[in-house]
From Swiss-Prot:
Part of the 50S ribosomal subunit. PROSITE patterns: RIBOSOMAL_L9. Gene3D superfamilies: Ribosomal protein L9, C-terminal domain, Ribosomal protein L9, N-terminal domain. Keywords: Ribonucleoprotein, Ribosomal protein, RNA-binding, rRNA-binding. The keyword Lipid metabolism does not apply. This is Large ribosomal subunit protein bL9.
Length: 148
């Protein structure tokens, strides 16, 4: 019996893949749990339409990421913080960087996609990687300076 997988299954395949399984496995396990649907003509057409729509969305996201890359790689974000000699009071997190970028340049980014292993705790220049799309990494220059 041919089915279209709706969820990735370890021993069968990935989402959208058409696989041949035993009828009992399909009727008693895959279909009732919503893990697959029968590979009928209409379901195959719906799958193709969904794949085309997903490809279009991915292309739009990549184009948006390319536009964002042009903006972000040509600027240096300056974040003023209260500080002593070299150490700052508190720390600068990915969320702080995203808020400062929005405030200073009007660009909104997702702080979860900013590669910051640990919060910044010293004054200085930093180059961080922001990944809005897997194929488009962006190098963001951040300068942490003492507040006057």
């Amino acid at each position: 019996m041919k089915v279209i997988l709706l969820e990735p299954l370890e021993n069968l395949g990935d989402v959208g893949q058409v696989v041949d399984v035993k009828p009992g496995y399909a009727r008693n396990y895959l279909l009732p749990r919503g893990l697959a649907v029968l590979a009928t003509e209409s379901n195959l057409k719906a799958l193709e339409a969904r794949i085309r729509a997903q490809a279009k969305r991915l292309a739009e996201r990549k184009a948006e990421a390319e536009r964002l890359k042009e903006i972000l790689e040509n600027l240096t974000l300056t974040i003023p913080v209260r500080a002593g000699e070299t150490k700052i009071y508190g720390s600068v997190t990915a969320k702080d960087i995203a808020e400062a970028l929005s405030r200073q340049h009007g660009v909104t980014i997702d702080p979860k996609r900013l590669a910051l292993e640990k919060p910044i705790k010293e004054l200085g220049e930093y180059v961080l990687t922001y990944k809005p799309h897997p194929e488009v990494p962006i190098q963001l220059k951040v300068s942490v300076v003492a507040q006057e």
